[in-house]
A protein has these predicted regions:
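Conserved alpha/beta enzyme-core scaffold
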Residues: 1-551
């Protein structure tokens, strides 16, 4: 042995351990028996494992999650769960039962209150709250999974998977395990005998160790469908201001819309109000977006050139199949979503992100984490920030330059579009984000801020627009936020003279300053007033889920 050389070590411990576990499973081939899944998981998962469980925004590997919740905690315990979206009750049952201990995630939605309670009770430990692309990236660095539990529509007996319109996170999750000696188990709705019986192959069988036919089709949530009947006049007024005061003002051609009625109103005003302003062909041409049904009228009216999707949306399958020039589809005609690539597109390739939040402080820092609610962020921190690595220019990006300096770079538009008060008369604008105290109480190393104020270029409320990128300093920035914060404590902290000065300089605009009459913000401007109208716009191709049908 050479001087200083370390003793011989074993270089394939992960591979050897995987082989040991696979050998312990009494099956031939790659198909696990549906009725024996719990027992199989007890052989394939070991205490302390890092386990990826595919809960996505829409698609849920729910048969696998329900089965994981039934394993014996004496056999499987202290798991470190890595879940993009925590959306089902059994996702947290495993912590109450002691099967899992630590959680790294991005979004929790309906489980946000329960996560907060489990954290307070000491039954769950949070690693970090991530943005999606950040969580995927860590799978290839320090969160390399021992096991990945994922979902697909169909598989053949060799493990080839068809994930189709709901491909979503699956490729990113699977590759991290498959190429670092992790075990990959896929639940599917349908098992076929041969690859030729699959519409296409989205994940090759060599990446998959086992498939199991689920006891019922995997759960999928139409998370991004908004009923136009619920769009209020305030949403329409804000949408008018967005189109005229931001989209047209800065020539926004590529963009992402966050979820909500505010952005749904914008989509439904493009064929009407946008048309009145003569903006077709000048704005909103390229989208990174889930296939929002409320975008159908704009597509049919010729506004939209392309849409790349994070995930699918129930009921939109046949409409997408019939519009391959707009959507990304496979040779079989069905859409191919990909959240990792769409998040990258939303980070580097779009001019603007516009979305809502639950709280905004005086400097435009925002968060969806509030007292008693640990909801996570999803993709907003990724798309709602200015990536300093960007090197291509567009008119909107260049329009953010405020100084004639040859070394100045452009900036992504990041717009927080909120009403000054949430439901229940809770102010959106607050002196201090709840996230600060949540971090202290939970022992987090940093406050769970969704979008930092220095990335926010505009704040849009029913009062008006604050063009924050034009602020000369933090004091003026705070005054601009206050000028559109209404009668919240933040809004009452600025006097009328200062607001008048900001309006005179064009750093803050109210509807009247843009030639928008508040009385014009009526539902008659919406291109579709109901889900039935969206179906009609689609030529009958859109097939909305039952809960959105009123006929």
């Amino acid at each position: 042995m050479l001087s200083g050389q370390i003793p011989t070590r074993q270089w394939n411990t992960r591979r050897s351990e995987k082989a040991r576990r696979l050998a312990s499973v009494p099956v031939q081939g790659k198909v696990l028996p549906t009725g024996d899944l719990v027992a199989m998981l007890e052989k394939l998962i070991a205490p302390g494992d890092k386990v990826v469980l595919e809960g996505n925004n829409q698609k849920q590997a729910d048969f696998l999650s329900r089965s994981l919740a039934e394993v014996n905690p004496q056999i499987v315990h202290d798991l470190h769960m890595i879940m993009p979206s925590v959306g089902r009750s059994e996702h947290l049952d495993i912590f109450e039962k002691g099967i899992a201990r630590k959680l790294d995630f991005s979004f929790s939605g309906t489980q946000s209150l329960r996560i907060s309670q489990l954290l307070e009770d000491g039954q769950l430990e949070i690693g970090a709250i991530h943005t999606y692309i950040e969580l995927y990236s860590r799978l290839y660095v320090d969160l390399s999974p021992n096991v990945a539990l994922i979902a697909g529509f169909k598989a053949d007996r060799k493990g080839n998977l068809y994930t189709g319109a709901s491909t979503e996170d699956t490729p990113a999750l699977v590759e991290a395990a498959a190429f670092h000696d992790g075990i990959v188990i896929a639940q599917v709705n349908v098992l076929v005998d041969d690859e030729c019986d699959l519409p296409r192959v989205d994940i090759p069988g060599s990446w998959i160790d086992y498939v199991v036919v689920a006891d019922k089709p995997f759960f999928i949530e139409p998370l991004f469908t908004r009923d136009p009947r619920l769009i209020k006049q305030e949403h329409i007024l804000m949408a008018m201001m967005a189109i005229k005061g931001i989209y047209a003002e800065h020539q926004v051609q590529s963009l992402n819309h966050g979820i909500g009625f505010n952005t749904a109103a914008i989509e439904l005003l493009l064929p009407t109000y946008g048309e009145q302003l003569g903006l077709k062909g000048k704005i909103c041409k390229h989208w990174t977006l889930n296939p929002h049904p409320t975008l159908i009228p704009a597509i049919e009216s010729g506004w939209v050139e392309s849409v790349h999707c994070f995930g699918g949306e129930l009921g939109m399958e046949e409409y997408i199949r019939a519009r391959p020039d707009v959507f990304f589809t496979g040779a079989d005609g069905s859409m191919r979503s990909n959240r990792a690539f769409c998040q990258l597109a939303g980070q580097y390739a779009v001019d603007m992100f516009i979305g809502s939040t639950l709280q905004v402080d005086g400097y435009a820092n925002s968060s969806t984490v509030t007292r008693g609610r640990l909801s996570g962020f999803g993709g907003a921190p990724n798309m709602g920030h200015d990536p300093h690595g960007r090197r291509h220019a567009t008119p909107a990006w260049l329009n953010m330059i405020t100084e004639p300096d040859p070394m100045q770079r452009g900036k992504k538009l990041v717009v927080q579009m909120v009403e000054t008060f949430q439901a229940g008369v809770k102010p959106t604008f607050v002196e201090k984000l709840d996230a600060v105290d949540v971090a202290k109480a939970s022992g987090m190393p940093l406050a769970p801020v969704m979008i930092y104020g220095d990335d926010v270029t505009h704040v849009l409320t029913e009062e008006g627009i604050a063009y924050l990128y034009r602020a000369k300093d933090l004091e003026e920035r705070r005054a601009m936020v206050a000028a559109v914060a209404g009668i919240t404590d933040i809004g009452l902290g600025v006097d009328a003279r200062r607001v008048a000065e900001l309006r005179q300089s064009g750093k803050v605009v109210y509807p009247e300053d843009m030639g928008i009459r508040r009385t014009d913000a009526t539902r008659s401007l919406l291109a579709a007033g109901s889900v039935a109208d969206l179906v009609e716009w689609s030529g009958g191709l859109y097939n909305p889920p039952a809960k959105f049908r009123s006929w």
